[in-house]
Amino acid sequence: MSGNSFERSDESNEQSSISIIEYVWIGGNGELRSKTRVLYSSIMTGYKLSDIPVWNYDGSSTNQANGSSSEVFLYPRNIYRCPFRRNVNGVIVICDTYDVNGVPLETNHRHNANIIFEKYQNEKPWYGLEQEYFIFRKDTNQPIGMEYASKQGQYYCSVGSQNAYGRRISDEHMEACLYAGIKISGTNLEVAPGQHEFQIGPVEGIDAADQLWIARFILEKISEHYDRYIVYHPKPLQGDWNGSGCHTNFSTESMRSEGGLTVIMEAVDKLRTKHSEHMKVYGIDNDLRLTGDHETASIDEFSHGIGSRQCSVRIPNDTVKNGYGYFEDRRPAANIDPYQVTSIILQTVCESD
């Protein structure tokens, strides 16, 4: 399911005339926002975007409008099953934002990304997004398990209650994403205590960014149930601790075809020339993470390598062996807007010299 429509598995006569729609959008500071709408109408042939009405909200409360003209309009762009309302006709819609004149807001990065994706749709770009994050306690404002930690290392892909802090949240998140129709492809505990990762993809085009935003939304909703909160900051812990990234795996159809390694190397050269431009949208405070330590490259210099995790762009060994495949851009931070990152990679790689 790419999010455009799906058939309901539960069509109880008692509740088929009620639909609960969760509208999700990105606020003025890059944060997730949502509001709920109940529709008293029957949708018997399956949910489609055309079934979901445009809505609005108070943009002056989200740093996206002033009080004299505060209405901001939500245009549904993709639709998913709601894992929190399984016994009713519940859906989540990812929306982008427009003013009263239909002009996209400055913070509406989806609009500009979609222009790029439409321009290069014949390239069939695939993305695999590796979202790292920390689970924090509200009472200490520290990662869960931090009070027992000595040094990092034992927590990566760990098992056992002395190592694996927050697994219940991670497991519930994975199952909820699968129910929603998100192409989550895995999870693991990460290097620091309370640090986790989930992966989305491979997903083609702008759907990858839509799915990552909704996966984040689901994760943050689940964390509410445990009175915890999610931190995407690139370096929330100072000292000898790993930061959090959103490594972005990318390929076009030509890269995945025979002889694709040559296309990949040409793409790496293009990324090198646009390094500083990319870093502008690769996450706030990313300089605290990209130091050359803790499996990162320096933010000041572009580098690439085969199988290396201490470079800007990694080319997997299997890609070199096969002569085709994908590359991994390791520079994006965990707090990126995926619309900006996925689209700038596509534009840089595919634009003519």
Swiss-Prot record:
Organism domain of life: Viruses
GO molecular function, one term: ATP binding
Cystines in this chain: none
Entry-linked InterPro entries: Gln_synt_N, Gln_synt_N_sf, Gln_synth/guanido_kin_cat_dom, Gln_synth_cat_dom, Gln_synth_gly_rich_site, Gln_synth_N_conserv_site, Glutamine_Synthetase
EC number: 6.3.1.2
Keywords: ATP-binding, Ligase, Nucleotide-binding
SMART domains cross-referenced by the UniProt entry: Gln-synt_C (SM01230)
One GO term (biological process): glutamine biosynthetic process
Listed SUPFAM superfamilies: Glutamine synthetase, N-terminal domain (SSF54368), Glutamine synthetase/guanido kinase (SSF55931)
Domain GS catalytic: 109-353
Reaction catalysed by this enzyme: L-glutamate + NH4(+) + ATP = L-glutamine + ADP + phosphate + H(+)
PANTHER family for this protein: GLUTAMINE SYNTHETASE, GLUTAMINE SYNTHETASE 2 CYTOPLASMIC
Family: Belongs to the glutamine synthetase family.
Protein name: Putative glutamine synthetase
Protein's organism: Acanthamoeba polyphaga mimivirus
